[in-house]
């Protein structure tokens, strides 16, 4: 029986005795007994009322917390009104904002017009349907693929390798009018091997999707060819889409193609691929003049409206063109207002004019790239320069625009009680953001985005202001931002149900402050004007982090949301930290003190304090300045996190290292805790977390703690590898250990580019300021930079991909790919921009 239950039963028994005595006395003295009975009844009524008011008060507080969790923050937006509209930002209205598809464009709108590409090689495997390619997938066998050039606004060129095929997708935008201007695509299909005796038969599928009441009117030419699509929307006005006849690559002479078309109501964006697959059920003949026919599976041969859905559901129109490679096809969007505004006089952006525009944009990209990052001037090889261009282009080409409602589990301020509540929908919000991986994580992640914008802001500061403004627009009334943004049907369809809900008690590293630091140091007037508007939201976000994640003692902090100590977990994960399975205290408790979180809060206090002073926010500066000073005071950090027995900084909590996974049939692998039993102590997990005071440059150059951290960093028995700093010491009991039977190691030894970037920035800093460790830091900086750059380049040359993580044993890429999120930081490492 629980102690609380025993207390309740004892109190109930003791409470009965006085009442019995009063009743006995009342029998002896009726009048006195009546008076005492009235007093007792009044007292009981008071108790009942107090309990009722207490319970109702708790319910009211809980209701208010739920309401605040699901209410947007009242502070003014950091962005102008209608900042995504064609009237305010016409040059950004259209874009490749669908990172999860191999090639597609959409408008920055809650009800967008969407376009996209699918393809299939016909007859590649006799007797089986062709493999239809549309969305980027980890296991579909396509690759390598990615953007060779992408400037984030007006131009891009991508190469896709798919078995025997090599596709090149290109686009150019042309400004004009009031609705975002015109754009043109060119898709080129060639055999992978030159001089092949037989040319593959390939179908390309170009489609248009509306998401509401918009009008599409197709015009069909001879033999089922979709000549054009006329349309109108409230945001685009009148427009026309035209699919030109295929030609040989680099030529303007048309080639013979076979055409099929399909038109229906919009089945829902996640169902587009399946709908097309289900309609590829009829055999047709592709018969060029003077050549033998080839059979292919095609869409229905004539245009007819199918599956008319409810009003407002939208339309889906797709054209299939089939012929033998090599060939090119161009797809053109023309805005009605751009035509009347002068673009018509310039002619359509097709053929030789399109070629000229593509070449001009490619040359301009290369010139601007060198001017911005100066890799050639700094002595980087041509291969490294190309790697830098691909890293930047992949990051910019992965920027998406999302709109929808996320699922949120409100914070009741009582850990564990959230499990008794149902998640609810957050208000509909837009998000303009980079993504970590087009194939595996094609959505916004809070702690990734800060690293993304470190790269983007060097290239296009306006894009960074747009992204930060959108992320800060997700703030709820308490100042919380969900760490993973799953907005819209397409994003939701790619996430397992158990990961859809974002918990309003859980934080994430505040990496959006990293590009804010660069803004502060750069003194760009546009950046400072943005920060002035953004400050109330930045302050609210930081205040929520500082207060909600407070630890058991002053100036300590604890990540809320660690996994429960289940019998199958070697070490309960801490997903909110971003470091997932990095070892923490073996037995989660409220007594934990997390070093990395304290360092993030210290960085936040420093940045917000400096920003408040620069903006003249005196009240906020008076609050934040002392907090920043306290958090950076060496004695406080030492007292809470320096582990003398380990010789490094560390987490603190209820911990034992006597844990392991053992086979226990039929359960499988289960955690076994040996001796000594857990006790409150520093956590002996030397790795990335141990370095955080160094990584975030919180240590004075003369600090006696700096030397030991540099020694650990440089020790191959611990963190140093020929490929970068490993995430966990090679001497750790958790090194490369699975966390469960089905959960391989993640942050337990692999090399991660984001932390290596922070380490290089810190080494660069300490190697350039006076102090006893200046020479050692500078030497380590040059060696680590060379190792990281060399390995990322070699792996890219071998595989054609940037990877999520790299092996500390042989350098090979691991995890998902392409991963042109924070791995694109290799560009800043090559440019020595920290």
UniProtKB/Swiss-Prot annotation:
Keywords of the record: Endoplasmic reticulum, Glycoprotein, Glycosidase, Hydrolase, Membrane, Signal-anchor, Transmembrane, Transmembrane helix
UniProt-listed Gene3D superfamilies: 1.50.10.10, Glycosyl hydrolase family 63, N-terminal domain
UniProt EC number: 3.2.1.106
Active site: 580, 804
Pathway: Glycan metabolism; N-glycan degradation
Regulation: Inhibited by the deoxynojirimycin derivative N-9'-Methoxynonyl-1-Deoxynojirimycin.
Highest taxon of source: Eukaryota
Cellular location(s): Endoplasmic reticulum membrane
Biased composition (Basic residues): 1-10
Example GO biological process: oligosaccharide metabolic process
Glycosylated sites: 654
Cited SUPFAM superfamilies: Six-hairpin glycosidases
Ranges for region Disordered: 1-37
GO molecular function, one term: Glc3Man9GlcNAc2 oligosaccharide glucosidase activity
Annotated spans, Required for endoplasmic reticulum targeting: 74-136
Comp. bias intervals (Basic and acidic residues): 17-31
One Gene Ontology cellular component: endoplasmic reticulum membrane
PANTHER family, alphabetized: MANNOSYL-OLIGOSACCHARIDE GLUCOSIDASE
Family assignment from sequence similarity: Belongs to the glycosyl hydrolase 63 family.
Protein's job: In the context of N-glycan degradation, cleaves the distal alpha 1,2-linked glucose residue from the Glc(3)Man(9)GlcNAc(2) oligosaccharide precursor in a highly specific manner. (Microbial infection) Required for successful influenza or dengue virus infection; inhibition of its activity by a deoxynojirimycin derivative prevents death in mice infected with lethal doses of influenza or dengue viruses, even when administrated after infection.
The protein, known as: Mannosyl-oligosaccharide glucosidase
Provenance organism: Mus musculus (Mouse)
């Amino acid at each position: 029986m629980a102690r609380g239950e025993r207390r309740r039963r004892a109190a109930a028994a003791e409470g009965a005795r006085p009442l019995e005595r009063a009743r006995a006395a009342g029998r002896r003295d009726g009048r006195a007994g009546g008076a005492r009975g009235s007093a007792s009844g009044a007292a009981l009524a008071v108790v009942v009322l107090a309990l009722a008011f207490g319970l109702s008060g708790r319910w009211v507080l809980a209701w208010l917390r739920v309401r605040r969790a699901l209410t947007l923050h009242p502070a003014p937006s950091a962005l102008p009104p209608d900042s995504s509209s064609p009237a305010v930002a016409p040059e950004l209205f259209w874009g490749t904002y669908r990172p999860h598809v191999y090639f597609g464009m959409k408008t920055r709108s809650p009800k967008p017009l969407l376009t996209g590409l699918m393809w299939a090689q016909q007859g590649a495997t006799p007797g089986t349907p062709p493999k239809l390619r549309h969305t980027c997938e980890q296991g579909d066998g396509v690759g390598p693929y990615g953007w060779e050039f992408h400037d984030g606004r007006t131009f891009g060129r991508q190469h896709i390798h798919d078995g025997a095929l090599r596709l090149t997708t290109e686009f150019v935008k042309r400004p004009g009018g009031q609705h975002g201007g015109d754009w043109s695509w060119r898709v080129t299909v060639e055999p992978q091997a030159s001089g092949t005796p037989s040319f593959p038969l390939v179908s390309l599928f170009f489609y248009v999707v509306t998401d509401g009441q918009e009008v599409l009117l197709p015009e069909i030419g001879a033999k089922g060819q979709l000549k054009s699509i006329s349309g109108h929307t409230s945001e685009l006005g009148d427009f026309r889409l035209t699919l030109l006849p295929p030609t040989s690559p680099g030529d303007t002479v048309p080639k013979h193609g076979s055409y099929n078309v399909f038109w229906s109501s919009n089945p829902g964006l996640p169902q587009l691929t399946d709908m097309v697959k289900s309609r590829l059920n009829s055999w047709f003949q592709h018969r060029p003049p003077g050549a033998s026919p080839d059979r292919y599976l095609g869409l229905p041969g004539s245009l007819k409206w199918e599956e008319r859905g409810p009003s407002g559901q939208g339309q889906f129109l797709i054209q299939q063109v089939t012929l033998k490679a090599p060939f090119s096809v161009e797809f053109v969007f023309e805005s009605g207002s751009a035509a009347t505004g002068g673009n018509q006089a310039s002619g359509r952006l097709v053929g030789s004019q399109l070629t000229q525009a593509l070449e001009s944009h490619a040359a301009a990209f290369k010139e601007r790239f060198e001017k911005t990052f100066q890799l050639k001037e700094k002595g980087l090889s041509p291969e490294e320069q190309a790697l830098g261009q691909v890293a930047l282009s992949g990051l910019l080409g992965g920027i998406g625009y999302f709109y929808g409602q996320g699922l949120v589990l409100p914070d009741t301020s009582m850990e564990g009680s959230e499990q008794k509540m149902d998640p609810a929908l957050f208000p509909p919000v837009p998000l303009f953001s980079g993504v970590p991986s087009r194939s595996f994580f094609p959505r916004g992640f809070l702690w990734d985005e800060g690293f993304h914008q470190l790269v983007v802001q060097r290239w296009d500061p306006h894009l960074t202001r747009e992204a930060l403004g959108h992320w800060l627009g997700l703030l709820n009334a308490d100042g919380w931002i969900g760490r993973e943004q799953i907005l819209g049907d397409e994003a939701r369809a790619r996430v397992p149900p158990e990961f859809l809900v974002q918990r309003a008690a859980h934080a994430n590293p505040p990496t959006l402050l990293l590009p804010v630091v660069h803004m502060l140091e750069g003194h760009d007037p546009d950046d400072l004007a943005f920060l002035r508007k953004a400050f109330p939201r930045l302050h609210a976000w930081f205040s929520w982090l500082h207060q909600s994640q407070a630890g058991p003692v002053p100036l300590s902090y604890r990540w809320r949301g660690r996994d429960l100590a289940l019998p199958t977990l070697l070490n309960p994960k801490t997903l909110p930290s971003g470091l997932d399975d990095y070892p923490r205290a073996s037995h989660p408790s409220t007594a934990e003190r997390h070093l990395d979180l304290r360092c993030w809060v210290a960085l936040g206090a420093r940045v917000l304090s400096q920003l408040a002073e620069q903006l003249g926010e005196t009240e906020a500066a008076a609050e934040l300045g002392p907090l920043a000073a306290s958090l950076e005071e060496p004695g406080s950090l030492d007292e809470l996190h320096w582990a003398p027995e380990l010789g490094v900084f560390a987490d603190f909590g209820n911990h034992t290292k006597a844990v392991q996974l053992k086979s226990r049939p039929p359960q499988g692998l289960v955690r076994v805790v040996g001796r000594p039993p857990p006790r409150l102590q520093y956590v002996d997990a030397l790795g990335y977390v141990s370095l955080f005071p160094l990584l975030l440059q919180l240590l004075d150059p003369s600090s006696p703690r700096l030397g030991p951290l540099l020694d650990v960093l440089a020790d191959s028995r611990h963190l140093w590898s020929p490929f970068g700093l490993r995430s966990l010491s090679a001497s750790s009991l958790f090194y490369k250990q699975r966390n469960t039977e089905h959960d391989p190691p993640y942050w337990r030894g692999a090399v991660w580019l984001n932390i290596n970037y922070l380490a290089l920035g810190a080494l660069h800093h300490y190697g350039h300021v006076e102090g006893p460790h200046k020479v050692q830091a500078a030497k380590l900086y040059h060696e680590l930079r060379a190792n990281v750059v060399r390995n990322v380049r070699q792996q890219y040359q071998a595989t054609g991909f940037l990877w999520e993580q790299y092996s500390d044993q042989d350098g090979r890429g691991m995890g998902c790919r392409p991963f042109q999120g924070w791995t694109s930081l290799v560009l800043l490492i090559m440019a020595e921009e920290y």
